[in-house]
Amino acid sequence: MTEITFKGGPIHLKGQQINEGDFAPDFTVLDNDLNQVTLADYAGKKKLISVVPSIDTGVCDQQTRKFNSEASKEEGIVLTISADLPFAQKRWCASAGLDNVITLSDHRDLSFGENYGVVMEELRLLARAVFVLDADNKVVYKEIVSEGTDFPDFDAALAAYKNI
């Protein structure tokens, strides 16, 4: 089991760890209208998956805005996944004035978190992470942020996304 910190305290990550070069496992999450969504729904497109503990926090808000602003300039898709309820994600999108942001909720089964090794066991939230997948769902970049309240390496993730 991998360990990170969150606000300085130790947190254990559970789930299957994936690495660069692996093919990304499938997952089932919910969109803002409670429809089931899987990785297969985005087949044939490169993907930047931004994982946040809660969309309602300052760091998560900034991470979501930054990746959507920068990566949306490229061909492909940006997904933001958290364990927030779909209603909270929908409210955040509306209050942020962002209609092109795709937020997905892993609250029900933690399917994404378990399959990508980012479930913070003690908090039942997802750890801050970034995964970049090519159009065939091969993982070309992975970062699990070692301190959950820190930002990911935006430059490295965006460079990996742009270079696919």
UniProtKB/Swiss-Prot annotation:
Disulfide bonds join C60-C93. Keywords: Antioxidant, Disulfide bond, Oxidoreductase, Peroxidase, Redox-active center. The active site is at C60 (cysteine sulfenic acid (-soh) intermediate). Residues 18-163 form the Thioredoxin domain. It is an enzyme of class 1 (oxidoreductase). Pfam families: Redoxin (PF08534). It catalyses: a hydroperoxide + [thioredoxin]-dithiol = an alcohol + [thioredoxin]-disulfide + H2O. SUPFAM superfamilies: Thioredoxin-like (SSF52833). GO terms for molecular function: thioredoxin peroxidase activity. Its EC number is 1.11.1.24. Coiled coil: none annotated. Homodimer. Thiol-specific peroxidase that catalyzes the reduction of hydrogen peroxide and organic hydroperoxides to water and alcohols, respectively. Plays a role in cell protection against oxidative stress by detoxifying peroxides. Belongs to the peroxiredoxin family. Tpx subfamily. HAMAP family: Tpx. The active site is a conserved redox-active cysteine residue, the peroxidatic cysteine (C(P)), which makes the nucleophilic attack on the peroxide substrate. The peroxide oxidizes the C(P)-SH to cysteine sulfenic acid (C(P)-SOH), which then reacts with another cysteine residue, the resolving cysteine (C(R)), to form a disulfide bridge. The disulfide is subsequently reduced by an appropriate electron donor to complete the catalytic cycle. In this atypical 2-Cys peroxiredoxin, C(R) is present in the same subunit to form an intramolecular disulfide. NCBIfam families: PRK00522.1. This is Thiol peroxidase. It comes from Staphylococcus aureus (strain MRSA252). The gene is tpx.
